[in-house]
């Protein structure tokens, strides 16, 4: 595509050089640049793309888009703009032929429940014989083809490329997790959403957003990008605030909840270790529904997916069949099979609200003890560490504090911050830095009927310690320990 065509709708400050050159690709990572490409300088949290212009040119970049004034770029077209992040989204959409226009795009945002909700929506739509794409934390899916996910929401140029691949493969709907970072950093700009979904909002990422109000404002942006409907949990106080504000917009407002009167509701809820059952009440039909993921939080996720499906016209009987056919979501209250006498549950819960929900869900389905193994990630929001410790100390019969992904932080210091919260309670706890040994301790400590809850990493298959990334899968490790310690049931195979 000609550079002049790419720049046609871009608000530029200045252009130096030839505009009639042909651009074969667009990059923001100088290491990936190929000949005849355009390089966009993005100011990141740790690096600044402006520092890698020379490297990009040496690798073949023939045009540079930057926020800073540059000189001495002979033979290279230089384009200065006010905001390269916003422009990257515009360029990506134009370069790939505005692909989101060819998809029914559904965005799901919220602190917790995004992954489960997107998987549920995908399953319902597939039950409606649709070819569905999914973009999220665990993986990206183009129909039945799985593609590794690098982050919850890809950078805008990568996102537009994924949309293009989906459109080329005749995907009809794309369901995607939309993180607050993605909304704040313009990753989903130029993406045309039909439906926006709000699950809930509790303190998280405050190292980035600084306070809960900024966090909510970032999430709220999604509902100004939609054209058909906004689906919002009004039991959540932040959701109620957002719903009140966006109800005046053109897209229809569909609310869901359990406590407050809403468009879509769950009543008479019963939960077991294997599932949650409730009376589904909607404007288009009512039914007794069983979802194979236990917990009240699972009922909320199901309501979000059901309300979304109603918004885009899926028949009620198809919705009910679809939501009940979901086998589960990887790392979301996932039972580790093959263990005798007690249960082991693995969950991604890594926020205060999430860990409270999963511990409470475990307590609701056993009359015995709940032993919680958890930690907190390094180089992330530090304010939640003592809070999570206090929650586990208050609710768990025994807390085993361990490493999550310490990254570049001292693991011991993270553990001490968690311990400070537990000390505010009368809860029993122990500290075992090595995650494998912490899981081993909890499983050896468990008695008949107990639940060992391993929280924080869920589906993740690695652990990051310093600059090292090691293979570590909570489910797999639990199975290995069960076999090593004679805790496995040879008659059950996972």
UniProtKB/Swiss-Prot annotation:
Keywords: ATP-binding, Cell cycle, Cell division, Cell shape, Cell wall biogenesis/degradation, Cytoplasm, Ligase, Magnesium, Nucleotide-binding, Peptidoglycan synthesis. A motif (Meso-diaminopimelate recognition motif) lies at residues 404-407. One of its GO terms (molecular function) is magnesium ion binding. It is found in: Cytoplasm. Its cofactor is Mg(2+). One of its GO terms (biological process) is cell wall organization. ATP binds at residues 110-116. The modification N6-carboxylysine is found at residue 219. UDP-N-acetyl-alpha-D-muramoyl-L-alanyl-D-glutamate binds at residues 30, 152-153, 179, 187. Carboxylation is probably crucial for Mg(2+) binding and, consequently, for the gamma-phosphate positioning of ATP. Its EC number is 6.3.2.13. It catalyses: UDP-N-acetyl-alpha-D-muramoyl-L-alanyl-D-glutamate + meso-2,6-diaminopimelate + ATP = UDP-N-acetyl-alpha-D-muramoyl-L-alanyl-gamma-D-glutamyl-meso-2,6-diaminopimelate + ADP + phosphate + H(+). Meso-2,6-diaminopimelate binds at residues 380, 404-407, 456, 460. Belongs to the MurCDEF family. MurE subfamily. This is UDP-N-acetylmuramoyl-L-alanyl-D-glutamate--2,6-diaminopimelate ligase. It comes from Alkaliphilus metalliredigens (strain QYMF).
